[in-house]
Structure formats: structure tokens, C-alpha cells
Curated annotation (Swiss-Prot):
UniProt keyword list: DNA damage, DNA repair, DNA replication, Ligase, Magnesium, Manganese, Metal-binding, NAD, Zinc
Family statement: Belongs to the NAD-dependent DNA ligase family. LigA subfamily.
Matching PROSITE patterns: BRCT, DNA_LIGASE_N1, DNA_LIGASE_N2
Protein name per the record: DNA ligase
Domain BRCT residues, every copy: 577-656
Catalytic residues (positions): K112
Protein species of origin: Helicobacter pylori (strain ATCC 700392 / 26695)
Superkingdom to which the source organism belongs: Bacteria
GO cellular component annotations of the record: cytosol
Amino acid sequence: MIKSQKEYLERIAYLNTLSHHYYNLDEPIVSDAIYDELYQELKAYEEKNPNGIQANSPTQKVGATTTNSFNKNPHLMRMWSLDDVFNQSELQAWLQRILKAYPSASFVCSPKLDGVSLNLLYQHGKLVKATTRGNGLEGELVSANAKHIANIPHAIAYNGEIEIRGEVIISKKDFDALNQERLNANEPLFANPRNAASGSLRQLDSEITKKRKLQFIPWGVGKHSLNFLSFKECLDFIVSLGFSAIQYLSLNKNHQEIEDNYHTLIREREGFFALLDGMVIVVNELNIQKELGYTQKSPKFACAYKFPALEKHTKIVGVINQVGRSGAITPVALLEPVEIAGAMINRATLHNYSEIEKKNIMLSDRVVVIRSGDVIPKIIKPLESYRDGSQHKIERPKVCPICSHELLCEEIFTYCQNLNCPARLKESLIHFASKDALNIQGLGDKVIEQLFEEKLIFNALDLYALKLEDLMRLDKFKIKKAQNLLDAILKSKNPPLWRLINALGIEHIGKGASKTLAKYGLNVLEKSEAEFLEMEGFGVEMARSLVNFYASNQEFIRSLFELLNPKNSDMAEEKQKSSSVFNNKTIVLTGTLSKPRQEYAQMLENLGAKISSSVSAKTDFLIAGENPGSKLALAQKHGVSVLNEEELLKRLKELD
């Protein structure tokens, strides 16, 4: 909280420094959430002391200044930034101010993409200039680089002068690949996709931009001479020119509809192809927009409804080591608890000791932590400017934390080689029951942990000796649940050979390699290293891993194959796939279903379907539960076949 004019001036200077690093240098010093918190405190102080507002306050200007790297270029019409709202009450207040004066107003809602704003100027149907937002009045001319963005049309079917505005982004998938390349090359990593997009767009060498797989998603227009009546009409016109459509776009009439779409976006956020940080809300009627006008910095007819933060700063207070099924040791940081998106986070993965060394992460460091859905949070980088001498190196362990067996230290990974290590056995069983292995429904991590604690199982063979009374000893198990699990275990017998090979959890051998091996018959694992090397796609590491695994586990493998009697081919499974209406079809699931979506997704994948998180013209089926949200409207718009849960179950039953 700012208490004096002196603190107010200091806060302005600090926020301007943060903005410079974020917008101009592409090197954020703090997370978006921390910046927003500091900014809101500044704004609150100014609301109480309006006579003392400084012209250089970040509340009075749009984020970036132009640098010396590119020529400056003015926008024909100013590019504004949006005011933020952070909760229901702030949104309600914003809506009431508009609806009180304009009760008939409607609102266009769309995802707020976390990228770099770009203004494209077209004259006589040709792209003539591309300019970053900059300070809103002028930006940096990046035309050569923009022309390397694949989905920006160089020509459009409209001859008038028009500015088309949108966000330059990099998909999560391409961002991860880019950072992996930089890690391998010992280059500094991008902090997040937004900074990767900005750094890639503002390259002096446009060939680098070309390689970065940037995308442009339009969200509006600047200067033009068209007679639109609504904002939605304007967006539809942009798409008709050949630009990408905005996914999850919706037209809403009241607070509840807006909230529903906001929470739909939060639910779909993790599966969305790009990083989102909120939802943009814009008054649809252009005559109302004109009457509402602008503040010093922002339009009064639009706002950004921000998501809860997924990125925070905290301190590493310790490191523990976990053991995987292959024996690989994964270091996990113990953190000072920090709330991220409604969850209290107290640990995050450090991946491996090679990465710790490359990123120069130390014990007692302040670090940037991100959370992605239900996956364990991860540490992006240390904040070296916070170091005070109390930090020290995170040492590689020499013995297994579970069985105390001496560890093998390779260049990247550290391994426990004890095949009877309890941690390895437990993780092996979790993999054995997983969806790409034997797919035993109801046999998840927590159940396997309980079975180990009760000393009911020690390896996969023990699963098939379990009795009803054994399972009744487990927490929350009653007769029906216990019987269902026994039935699922029994059903896993006679699996396709590739599934059983994959279930063994052999290092370097995944689903694809298992399918290749299965083509060579039931005795394939007895082959020599030379014979494995002759197989398509198999290298030295894979061949040696297979030979070593079989040599160490011959008796276990023979017993397991005898008990489960795998099918020599998966012809039955492939036949079911090929006869399935869902084979090679793209399917999206939405809304509330009677079973978890993941369970239906697995059933459909087993029938050859491809599961997607977003609806497009390429979607074949939408499975719609209760409260399907905007995906249903989008599916209907694209002519996608829509099935409710009852219809889906009927079709699945027909395939049995």
C-alpha cells in the first residue's frame, strides 16, 4: 500500500523500469501477477489523490517506448491498452456503468492472448506496413519480419485503406521446442511465450523470425472507411479476408453469460494451443462505443477480465529426490508456500541435475514458478538479482534416497540401478496400469500406493493374485468398488502384445517402439543386440536397453507372459478401430459428463480417434455434456456433428 507522495513517485519509477524490461528488452524482472498487484496499488493511490497524478505514471500511458533497433512509425489511429478487472465485483461495477446508460448493450467476449500487439496497414489490397503497438501513438516498423508470419495475408480482397490489429503469439508447443533448442545450445531461455514472440518479432535478422513459427490472431481494426454497425460484424469481416478466426468468441447480454464464458475459458485454458491471461470484453454496438469514448489510456467500452495468476515468485528452502520406474532420480524443490491460481504450491520439479546446473539454480534462491493444470509446478529460472550470499550449490546425491544403493551418474541423468528398489517397483506398477500400457481402469497411483503399504503387492504378477478381501482392507473400498477393480484386472489379460511390452517400462522403449517389436512375435525380447539394430528406428541405446532388461528380468518376463497370454498381434484391436465411426476422426469433448472426460477420451482414442481441446472446421464430432458453453455454438457454426452423452454411449455399445 502506498502511503505518501514520496512512495508514489518511487513506485512510478519502479513500474516504469519493469515496463521497460518487459516491453522493450523482453526480459521481465517480475511476474505479471506481481506487476498487476503493484500497478493496482498505484492506481488506488491516484484515485484518492487525483490532483497529484504524474504525467509519467504508467496509468497515463500505453506500455512500451520505441527503441533504436527499428524505425519508428506512427499509427493512423491510436492503439489503446485495456483496463483490467480481476474479480466478479470489479466486473459487475464495470458492467453497471455501461448498462445503466445503455440497457440494450451486448458484449463480445474472446480469449486474451498473451502476445505482442501488431498493427497491419493494407492499401489497395496489399500489406504495406506492420508496426508494433509501442506507446500507442507510434511503434516499431517490423514489416519484413511480419511478412514471415505464415498466417498474415500479403494481399486481401479489399482495396480501401485499413489497419487490422491483432496479437502475435507463439504456440505452447512451439515455445517448448524453441526453449529446448536454446537449452541444448547453452543459450538463455525465454521466460514465457509472450517474450519469445516479442523477441522473435523484433529480430534484426528476419530469417530468424521466419524459423520461430509465429502466428497472428486478429482482434480488431484501426482506421478504415467501412460502415460496420457492430464489433462482431467487424471481426467477421476480418476473417472473411483470410485471417485466422478467434476461438471461443461469444456474444453475451448480461453478467451471468459473461461469467459463464469466463469460467469456460479457465477450464479450457490448459488445453488451449497458446498462452491466455484473461478474457477481453468489448461492447458490441459501435454507436455505444463511440458515445462511451476513452480515458487518458484506455477505451471505456472494453476491459480485460484477468485470469488468476499461474506464475509467482518464491524461495527454494530444500530439495528432495524422487525415484522413477527406470531408476532415474528427479530432484524436486521444496518451496516457501505460494498460492498460484487458487492452489497452495509448496514444491516444484527441477527435472534433473544437468538442468539445475545449466539454469544455475541454487538452494535459497528466489525463483519463478509456473503451474500448468494438475501437473506438478516447475521452476523456470532463478532471480539472481535477489542473491545475498546465503545461496549454495544443489549437490547431486551419491546414494538412492529410498534403498541407499549407490547411484550411477551420467551426463544428464542420475540412476538407481537396484531393480528391487521399492520406489522403482511402485512407479513400474503405476506405468504398468496406465492407459498406453494395460489400461487397468481404477488402478491409479493412490490405490497402488495403498497396495504397497499393505504389502499386498511387490510386482505386476501379484496384481493377478489379489482377492476381494485384500481390496476391502484399502481406504474407501467397499464391495462394489473392490469387485470393479478385480474385474478390470482380469480384463487386462490377453492384451495385444505391444501393450504388454510397453507395460514392462523398458528404458527408451515407448508405445511406438513396442508396436514395432510386437510385429516380430512373442519371443521378440529374446533377440540379440544386432537383431534389434536391424529393426526400423532402433538405435544402439534402445537395443542395449532391451538386451540388458531381458537379461536382468528373464524369469519375471516369462512368468508374466505365461499368466497374461498376450495376443500375437493387435489385429482385433485394429479391426475394431477400422470399423469404428470414430476412426481417424477429430473429436472434442465439452460440458459436464457422467464420467470423467479423460475416461471417454481414452475410449475414443482406443477406437482410433484424435482428441482435441478446441473446435475448428476440421473437427468431426463434438461430444456435448451439460452446460457445453461456447464450443457448442462454434461447432454448430462449423457444421460439426454434435452428440450428447446418450448418443455417444449408444454408438460405443454398437462397437462392442
